[in-house]
Curated annotation (Swiss-Prot):
GO terms for biological process: apoptotic process; bleb assembly. InterPro entries: EMP_1, PMP-22/EMP/MP20-like, PMP22/EMP/MP20/Claudin, PMP22_EMP_MP20. It is a multi-pass membrane protein. This is Epithelial membrane protein 1. The gene is Emp1. The keyword Transmembrane helix applies. The chain crosses the membrane at residues 1-21, 67-87, 95-115, 137-157.
Length: 160
């Protein structure tokens, strides 16, 4: 049981770090053939991330930014609550609070990435003629899976 909780703790920390990276880095869409990428915050061309987003004032991108930041916040809160419950909770109880907080993180990731996918991932007008999803987009979907698994495991596990 201790090994399972330690492994869950490590995966939770890795998920929080991946959420930070995917939200901060500007590689959500990458242009084919030229050294350019587009993120949630800036356009990057030839290693310089000076350009602001052409659609930076759109409500959809602001919603994606907000939900990704909320997912980071809920992931960290869930981690702190898990550690707190680990040391203060009586034996036999379940980690409901940390599990439900992590599932809220999962929901924020789902909403944010779904909005981005709907509005920007397949829109040819906003991006380069030929582009593909960058590592941040893929990393966010990986965090989506991990946060769901972690949230469910927190809800199922009992402290022994």
């Amino acid at each position: 049981m201790l090994v399972l909780l330690a492994g869950l703790f490590v995966v939770h920390i890795a998920t929080a770090i991946m959420l930070f990276v995917s939200t901060i880095a500007n590689v959500w869409m990458v242009a084919d053939g030229i050294d350019s990428s587009i993120g949630l915050w800036k356009n990057c061309t030839s290693g310089s991330c000076d350009g602001s987003l052409s659609y930076g004032n759109d409500d959809a991108i602001k919603a994606v930014q907000a939900f990704m930041i909320l997912s980071i916040i809920f992931s960290i809160i869930s981690l702190v609550v898990f550690v707190f419950q680990l040391f203060t909770m009586e034996k036999g109880n379940r980690f409901f609070l940390s599990g439900s907080t992590m599932l809220v993180c999962w929901l924020c990731i789902l909403i944010g990435v779904s909005i981005y996918t709907h509005h920007y991932a397949h829109s040819e007008g906003n991006f380069f003629p030929s582009s593909h999803q960058g590592y941040c987009f893929i990393l966010t979907w990986i965090c989506f899976c991990f946060s769901f698994i972690i949230g469910i495991l927190y809800m199922v596990l009992r402290k022994k």
